[in-house]
Amino acid sequence: MAPKSVASKAPASQASKAPAAASKAPAKAAKTSAAPKDGAKKRSKKRVESYSSYIYKVLKQVHPDTGISNKAMAILNSFVSDIFERIATEASKLASYNHRSTISSREIQTSVRLILPGELSKHAISEGTKAVTKYSSSK
C-alpha cells in the first residue's frame, strides 16, 4: 500500500493515472509472467490472410511492365478469397455426401465444374491437373 502514497505526490496529470494502473496490475500479472521482460511487445499483431503477393507475382509473369493499385489489389484479393471459399464449401459438401472425411483432388475438380461456367471450368481443371502433376513429380 506504500506506492499509493508515493503516487499521490506525483503531478496532477500523473496522479489520476497511477491508481488505474495499480488496479489493473493484478489482472495483468498473470498474463505478463510468461512474457519476456526485456521490453518486447506484449501482443503481436494479428496476421491477416492475403493473396496480394501471389497476385503480384502472376501479374509480373503475364505483364512485367504493368502495376496495380491498392484498390484493384483489394478487389482481386476479395475475389480470390470468395472463389476459394465457394470451392472449399462445395468440395466439403461433396465429401460429406460420399461419407468421406478427406477432400481429395477429385472433390475439388467436381466442385470447380459445378461452380465455374463452361470454358472457364475446362481451363481451370486443366491448369489444376497440370499443377497437381507437377507437384506429384517433384516429391
From Swiss-Prot:
Compartments (UniProt record): Nucleus; Chromosome
Principal subcellular localisation of the protein: nucleus
Modified residues (N6-acetyllysine): 9, 17
Post-translational modification note: Monoubiquitinated by the UBC2-BRE1 complex to form H2BK123ub1. H2BK123ub1 gives a specific tag for epigenetic transcriptional activation and is also prerequisite for H3K4me and H3K79me formation. H2BK123ub1 also modulates the formation of double-strand breaks during meiosis and is a prerequisite for DNA-damage checkpoint activation.
Keyword field: Acetylation, Chromosome, DNA-binding, Isopeptide bond, Nucleosome core, Nucleus, Phosphoprotein, Ubl conjugation
Region (Disordered): 1-48
SMART domains, sorted: H2B
Record location of the Glycyl lysine isopeptide (Lys-Gly) (interchain with G-Cter in SUMO) cross-link: 9
An MF annotation (GO) of this entry: protein heterodimerization activity
GO annotation, cellular component aspect: nucleosome; nucleus; site of double-strand break
Biased composition (Low complexity): 1-37
Cross-link for Glycyl lysine isopeptide (Lys-Gly) (interchain with G-Cter in ubiquitin), residue positions: 134
Modified residues (Phosphoserine): 13
Function recorded in the entry: Core component of nucleosome. Nucleosomes wrap and compact DNA into chromatin, limiting DNA accessibility to the cellular machineries which require DNA as a template. Histones thereby play a central role in transcription regulation, DNA repair, DNA replication and chromosomal stability. DNA accessibility is regulated via a complex set of post-translational modifications of histones, also called histone code, and nucleosome remodeling.
Family according to the record: Belongs to the histone H2B family.
Subunit structure: The nucleosome is a histone octamer containing two molecules each of H2A, H2B, H3 and H4 assembled in one H3-H4 heterotetramer and two H2A-H2B heterodimers. The octamer wraps approximately 147 bp of DNA.
Protein name: Histone H2B
Species of provenance: Cryptococcus neoformans var. neoformans serotype D (strain JEC21 / ATCC MYA-565)
Gene designation per UniProt: HTB1
